[in-house]
Swiss-Prot record:
Family from the record: Belongs to the universal ribosomal protein uL18 family.
Subunit structure: Part of the 50S ribosomal subunit; part of the 5S rRNA/L5/L18/L25 subcomplex. Contacts the 5S and 23S rRNAs.
Region annotated Disordered, chain positions: 1-26
Pfam families: Ribosomal_L18p (PF00861)
CDD domains hit by this protein: Ribosomal_L18_L5e (cd00432)
Keywords, comma-separated and alphabetical: Ribonucleoprotein, Ribosomal protein, RNA-binding, rRNA-binding
SUPFAM superfamilies given in the database record: Translational machinery components (SSF53137)
Name assigned to this protein: Large ribosomal subunit protein uL18
InterPro entries (UniProt xref): Ribosomal_uL18_bac-type (IPR004389), Ribosomal_uL18_bac/euk (IPR005484)
Gene name in the database record: rplR
GO cellular component, one term: cytosolic large ribosomal subunit
């Protein structure tokens, strides 16, 4: 039996991912954080160390337009579409996807596919 908790395993995977993954001004990093109740996504330029745009299930835009629970795949899809729209508005078309140590499945996958369909390429 493993002595690492689920959170520690996620942090270990995220460290391993971030070793080879960084965003630039031409191709920023799309970072996803998934909690039990919400999902957050940011487009980050690691060279300049600033966030170019962000979206989450805690925003007024999401809460006022959506009648779905924030911890569902439908909510993640809405966040992915919001983020892609904001990124395209700032002229960002290509990103590097950072799943944040979470498995590419469920809510993380729904956010990524929605962002792709809205126009981001990765």
């Amino acid at each position: 039996m493993s002595t690492l908790s689920r959170k520690q395993k996620t942090q270990k995977r995220h460290k391993r991912l971030r070793r080879n993954l960084s965003g630039t001004d031409q191709r920023p990093r799309l970072a996803v954080f998934r909690s039990n109740n919400h999902i957050y996504a940011q487009v980050i330029d690691d060279v300049a160390q600033n966030t170019l745009c962000a979206a989450s299930t805690l925003e007024k835009e999401f809460l006022s337009n959506s009648k779905v629970n924030a911890s569902t795949c439908a909510a993640s899809t809405a966040v992915g579409e919001m983020l892609a729209k904001r990124a395209l508005g700032k002229g960002i078309k290509q990103v590097v996807f950072d799943r944040g140590g979470s498995l590419y499945h469920g809510r993380v996958k729904a956010l990524a596919e929605a962002a792709r369909q809205a126009g981001l390429t990765f």
